[in-house]
Amino acid sequence: MAENAESAERFWGQFHGQNTGYLEQQFELYKEDPELVESSIRTIFDTHGAPSWLSSTENVKSVSNASDFDVTKLTSAIRLVEAIRRYGHTDADIYPVGGYKGDRSKMLDLSTYNLKEQDLEKIPASWIWEKQAPGVATALDVVNQLKKYYTGTITFEYDHVNNDEERKWLFDLIEEGNARLDPSDDERKKILQRLADVEGFEKFLHKTFVGQKRFSIEGLESMVPMIDHIVQYSNQDSIEHVMMGMAHRGRLSVLANVLGKPYDKIFSEFNYTKEKELMPSEGSRAINYGWTGDVKYHYGAEKEVEFGNKGQTRITLAHNPSHLEFVNPVVEGFTRAAQDDRSEKGYPKQVTNKAVSVLIHGDAAFIGEGVVAETLNLSGLPGYSTGGTLHIIANNLLGYTTDREDGRSTRYASDLAKGFEIPVIRVNADDPISCISAIKIAYEYRQKFQKDFLIDLVGYRRYGHNEMDEPRTTQPSLYQQIDDHPSVASLFGKGMEEKGILQEGGFEEVKSAVEKKLTDIYKGMTESEIGEPEAKLMPQVLTNGLDQFTTAIDLATLKSINEELLERPEGFKGFKKTERILQRRKDALEEGNKADWGTGEALAFASILKEGTPIRLTGQDTERGTFAHRHIVLHDVETGEKYSPLHGLSDVEASFDVRNSPLSEAGVLGFEYGYSVQSPDTLVIWEAQFGDFANAGQVIFDQFISSARAKWGEKSNMVLLLPHGYEGQGPEHSSARLERFLQMAAENNWIVANVTSSAQLFHILRRQAAMRDRDEARPLVLMTPKSSLIRHPRMGATAEEFTDGGFLALRDQPGFEANREKVTRLVVGSGKMMIDIEEAMDDSDETYDWLQIKRVEQIYPFPKKALEEEIKQLPNLKEIVWVQEEPKNMGAWNFVDDYLRELLNEDQKLKVISRPDRSAPAGGIPTVHKTAQNKIIKQALNQSEGGKSSAGN
C-alpha cells in the first residue's frame, strides 16, 4: 500500500541523475503489469507509489544530505532483506547436534548483490523496512535485526502460504518482534521443573529397568512443556477436548508428565510375571485369562484438567500401534466427532472450538508414510476438517538407523506440509523458550484462521531406536557428539543460574528432588504392584449372541417413512430420470411387490434416524452410490442446490451426515474409525467404491478395527460396506478379500456378513444401530452387491419380511422347500453364488428332492447351532458341500471348514466347490468367467458330481 504524499515525496527526493530515468522506465513497465518488473522494484512502487517527479509538476527538492544515490544499491538491499525472510531458515541455529545445517543459501550473502556493509550503512532503514524497530537506523541494522528473527533458534517458512491475510499476520508477528516470548522468572522455573521431571523420569527408567525398551524422549524433552502450553491455551479458550496422537518415541514421558499416568503404574508395566498364562489353550477358541493387551508404549490415556474458571478440558492420547502415522486420521476423527452436534436433523452442526487435534510425528515417518498426505488432504474438506491441527515433528535426525539423505528427497522432513500451504516453524529443541514461543504462534494461528500449523522440533535421540539398540555402529560421528552434549534441562538450568534466576547449585537440587521422589515411589510399591497388572476379561455379553435386538417395524410406520422419502421441497427440480427411478419405490411395500436393495437401505437409514440415532455415511461416490442405487443426495437441475430426502423427515432429532470422500482409503477409513470410537451414539458407515480397493486401508483393518478392543479396550460400532461379487470384471473389481476379514475374526471382535435380500440389509443395519453405545457393540463388515445384483428382483423383499421377524444368520433358499427325509446333500454358501444357484434351479425341471440348501448370511459369528439343528432334521444326509465363487484359497472356505467339519457324523463327508486355488482373485475374460461360474453351479446341483473333499474327511 502506498505511503502518504509527504512520506513518498521525501523518499523519491533521494534520487537524481541517471537513476530517475531508470526508475521512470521501470514505472512504465509496472503500470502495464507489476509482474514485468523485478520484485524489489515492485516493492518500491507498491510502498511509495509513483516517482514524485512524475506525479507533480513542481520541482521536488531533496530533503537528504546525500546528493546522487545509486538506486541499484537500494534495490539490492531490498532483495537481500526479502532473501532473509525467504531463505533465513537455511542459516538458522536449529540443530543442537549433528552439523546438519546443510547448504546455506547464497541469497543471504552480501556478495550475491554486489553489496558491502558500507553500502548498507548509507541506506536509511525506513527505505527498506516498514517496521523499523527501535535502534534500527540503517539498512545494515535492518539486515542484522532480521537475521535475529529468521536465523536464530526459531525460524519460519510461510512464503508458500497463498492467503494474503494469513501471510501478513505471520509477517507482522515476526517483524514486530513478537514471535519470541519472554517468560517471567517464575515461568522459567516452571519450565525447568517440567524438563527436570522428564529427564529424571527417563534416567530413572534407564538405570532401574536396564535394557528394556521405552523409546526415550531424551533429546526432545522440550516437547512436554510445548504440550503443556497447548493444553493451557485450550483450557483458557474453553476448548473441551485436546485430542493427541503420537508414536512410541517419548510416549511414556507424555503419559506420565502430561496425562498424569501414575509412576507406579508405569513402573509395574516394566516388570513381567512369567507364570501369567495369557495365551489360548491348544484347541480353544477363547482366551483363558483375558484379552491380549499391548506393550506399555502403545497405550493411550485420558485426563481432565482445569486452569482457572474456564471449565474442564479433557486430554486424550489415542492408543497407537507401531505402524507410524496411521493414528493421525483416527485422531482427526476423534476431534470431528467431538465438534459435531448431532442432535438435530440435517447435517451436524460443527463447532471447531470444542476440540483441537495435536499430532506428533516422526521426522522419517512424516514424509515417508503416505497416510500423512492423505490426512493433510482432509484438513480443508467440509466433511473432515477439524478447524486446524497442531502438528509437531519430533525430529531426532534419524529413522531407526537410516540417515536423512537416505530417507527423504527434500531438505526438511516438514516439506510435505508446504504443498498444503501449512506454515512451518523450525525450532531448536535445546531452546525451551523458542519451543513454547512456537507453540503460542501455532495455537493462535489455528484459532484465528482455523487451519493447520506445523512445528519441526529439531533435537536428537540420546540412545538408539530403542534402548537395546547400539546406534554407534551406524552413526558413530553423530553419537560422539550426542555423548558429549548436555541435556536441555542442564543447559537451561545452568543458564538460569548464570542469570541469577536460580542460585548456584539450584538445578542440582531440582534434579535430586525428582530422583528422590521417583525412588521413594518405586521402593514403596508392594510385590503385587510390581508384578504385571491383571489382564482384563473379555465382556461376557460379546459371547451371548445377537438375537435380543428387535429390528422389525410395523407396516403403517414403514409406509409412512417410504412416502416421506419421496417428498421434495417446494420448487425443487431433480433430474427427471433419477426421480422416475425413485418414484418406483412408492408402491414397493404394497402386496405382491418387493422393495429393492436401495429401498431397503433407505428405509433402514430413515427408521434409524426416526429412533434418534445419528448416522454418518461416507465413501467415494457414496451420495449417489457407485452403482447408482442410492441417490441419497439429489441435485436441482436448475440451481445446483443439493437436497437429501433423509434431511426432510419429520419428527427426527438426529443428524444424517452423508459425504463423498476424497480418493483415499487409509486416511478416510482411519478418520471414520476414530469418529465411531468418539461418538458411540452414532452409526458410522464407510463404503468402499469397490471392495477390492479396501485393502489400501489394510493397516486400519488390522491394527485398529479388528483388534483395538482386545488390545486397548477401545470400542467401535462402525459399518464397512464392501461391494463384492464375481461378474467377469477382472481381478480388481470382483473381491473385497472376504478371506482376510474372516482370518482376523476371533473373540467376537466383529461381524462378517454377506446378505442376499433388502430385508436382511434392513435388519442387520437396524441391529447394528441398536447395539450402539452398548457392551455388545462391535464393527460390521458387510459384503454388498454390485451391478448385476443391486437391482436384481431376487434381492428384493416383501413388506412382511421387513415387518416380521428379524435378521437371519442362516437363511432358507427362497422358493425351495426340501424333502428332508430324502436329502443326501446339504449345500451351504453365501452371497451372490446363492442367487446364481437359485436362478439355475428355477430354470431347471429337476425336483432336487435329494438336496437341501442353506444360505449363511452371517459368516462370523458362524451360525453353528442353527445349522446343527438343520442337520439333525436330515436323517439320510451323506455330504455337506460348501459352495463359493471365489478361488478355494480365498473366500470363506478356509474359515468355515473347521465349523462345518465339527458338524459331521463319521459317515458324512465335507466337500468344497469353488474355483481352483489362484494367486489373483478373478480372471479378466468375461467368457472364461461365465464358464467357470456355470461349472460351479452345475457341480452344486448335480447329484453325481461333487467338489473336492475337505482335508481330514
UniProtKB/Swiss-Prot annotation:
Keyword annotations: Glycolysis, Oxidoreductase, Thiamine pyrophosphate
Listed GO biological process terms: glycolytic process; tricarboxylic acid cycle
Pfam family, one: E1_dh
Biological role: E1 component of the 2-oxoglutarate dehydrogenase (OGDH) complex which catalyzes the decarboxylation of 2-oxoglutarate, the first step in the conversion of 2-oxoglutarate to succinyl-CoA and CO(2).
PANTHER family: 2-OXOADIPATE DEHYDROGENASE COMPLEX COMPONENT E1 (PTHR23152:SF4), 2-OXOGLUTARATE DEHYDROGENASE (PTHR23152)
Cofactor(s) this protein cannot do without: thiamine diphosphate
EC id: 1.2.4.2
Family affiliation: Belongs to the alpha-ketoglutarate dehydrogenase family.
Cellular component GO terms, alphabetical: cytosol; oxoglutarate dehydrogenase complex
GO MF term (any one): oxoglutarate dehydrogenase (succinyl-transferring) activity
Record text on subunit structure and interactions: Homodimer. Part of the 2-oxoglutarate dehydrogenase (OGDH) complex composed of E1 (2-oxoglutarate dehydrogenase), E2 (dihydrolipoamide succinyltransferase) and E3 (dihydrolipoamide dehydrogenase); the complex contains multiple copies of the three enzymatic components (E1, E2 and E3).
Protein name: 2-oxoglutarate dehydrogenase E1 component
Enzyme class, broadest EC rank: oxidoreductase
Catalytic activity: N(6)-[(R)-lipoyl]-L-lysyl-[protein] + 2-oxoglutarate + H(+) = N(6)-[(R)-S(8)-succinyldihydrolipoyl]-L-lysyl-[protein] + CO2
Matches recorded under InterPro entries: 2oxoglutarate_DH_E1 (IPR011603), 2oxoglutarate_DH_E1_bac (IPR023784), DH_E1 (IPR001017), KGD_C_sf (IPR042179), ODO-1/KGD_C (IPR031717), THDP-binding (IPR029061), Transketolase-like_Pyr-bd (IPR005475)
UniProt organism field: Oceanobacillus iheyensis (strain DSM 14371 / CIP 107618 / JCM 11309 / KCTC 3954 / HTE831)
Gene field: odhA
